[in-house]
């Protein structure tokens, strides 16, 4: 069943995990909320009320963020007739969230682009869904024409607060090389997009994500008679693998140096996140000592590669929809050329090639570093001349206190100054 309050909570949470690529502080985060619903339809008013309550009165206060601005679109339905048949499409309650925050320092902003110069790095998944892998509303479900029953949710706002604090702590230590939130398409899509951006191969390992129970007191893997157990376990493992790769629970994927991953896990432990943080993969840059997986996206389970494909092929598929739209909107020749370059390892993309040394100050030979002299005229009844002199001094001038009698007697000449302030 559709869970309107959960969708609202997830909209806020995903806006924050998107923003977390920058060094944000939660008290500085402000949200713009666009509430959309088909008011008057059965159950929709109640769903809207519950969603507003969940977001505005529960989640946001718990996170310490505010919603100073927003709008509403409360007629989200359309009706028409086809002959004697009346048709109607009604949209579910939706919340569109835009997040913004002022930063004390814009440096330290992270991107999804995998670092290609580090030879040995690890991917760390911080799974705020805590292994529930709820598939309702997922992209995978939609491709199979299924909406699902149980949807992802923000079960504990404190986990999100802890995530922000942990990522900022790791950022301050310089231990995060790349960052991407898990959202549309799940873990596999996030890893693929990071690999596309960096032209770096990735080998994911889902062993820790497909384990159920402890095998002793919790034996969820015991799904039937012993004679069918092997087949049932195999089918269940396939299902769990798909859920691990494509669930869209709240979470983030980090690239860290393998030599520092234990330190990273200790930081996550200090912020209460280690129990649901996992080492889920390794990168395969050109400089990697392991050749298998270079230029590919692989998924490993039980010491076997259950999926492997060249990054270039996956990038072409990933770009296909945008390419088709671009063909209709822009010059088709340019659209085709851009699509052909998608995933090409030798394509440098947008880049800068300077024909000079950026460290050189080309204006230096022409600069006159002498401070211009400026006369601050003073006469009886004048005030603020001291503040004016201070302002010009701070601006790089050499300020002189000049009284009108100085000019009358010839002690000072205006021709000696570059400017006069009166």
Regions found by a protein language model. Give the residues of each.
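Short phosphate-binding/catalytic loops that engage adenosine nucleotides
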Residues: 24, 273, 397
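Flexible gly/pro-rich beta->alpha loop and the following alpha-helix that scaffold active-site loops
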Residues: 386, 391-422
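A glycine-rich phosphate/pyrophosphate-binding beta-strand-loop-alpha-helix module
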Residues: 2-78
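Core alpha-helical transmembrane segments of integral membrane proteins
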Residues: 15, 19, 373, 383-385, ...
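Catalytic nucleophile loop
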Residues: 23, 181, 420-422
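Intein/HINT protein-splicing elements and their conserved insertion hotspots or analogous self-processing inserts
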Residues: 1, 48-51, 66-248, 257-373, ...
